Amino acid sequence: MSRAPISRTFTEGRLAQVLVAPIISEKATSIGEKHNQVLFKVLQDATKIEIKAAVELMFKVEVESVQVLNQKGKTKRFGGRTGRRDHLRKAYVSLKAGQELNFSGEAA
């Protein structure tokens, strides 16, 4: 028995909130060059499907796949007190061949 495809509709307001910020670091840049991937900090409750739809809507590119990871916040000392940084959810977005994302603000 095959399942019928589930139609998913997202509001543009929700999709605009899903992507919190791009992660631009040395590691993220090397991953982007090797595997044609882009890293984003996303909401804790964001799904892979929402992330894919948000990237395609905001940047007008085609997404091949999305992998996510949940990173626990580090325990750090602030003065004499111990605290914890916030937990983080990262999305590794693989772009289809020939697609490119540019964060510098210049037209590609």
Curated annotation (Swiss-Prot):
The lineage of its organism: Bacteria, Pseudomonadati, Pseudomonadota, Betaproteobacteria, Burkholderiales. One of its GO terms (molecular function) is structural constituent of ribosome. One of its GO terms (biological process) is translation. InterPro entries: Nucleotide-bd_a/b_plait_sf, Ribosomal_uL23-like, Ribosomal_uL23/eL15/eS24_sf. Part of the 50S ribosomal subunit. Contacts protein L29, and trigger factor when it is bound to the ribosome. The keyword Nucleotide-binding does not apply. Signal peptide: none annotated. It comes from the Bacteria. PANTHER family: 60S RIBOSOMAL PROTEIN L23A. One of the early assembly proteins it binds 23S rRNA. One of the proteins that surrounds the polypeptide exit tunnel on the outside of the ribosome. Forms the main docking site for trigger factor binding to the ribosome. Pfam families: Ribosomal_L23. GO terms for cellular component: ribonucleoprotein complex; ribosome. The gene is rplW. Keywords: Ribonucleoprotein, Ribosomal protein, RNA-binding, rRNA-binding. This is Large ribosomal subunit protein uL23. Belongs to the universal ribosomal protein uL23 family.
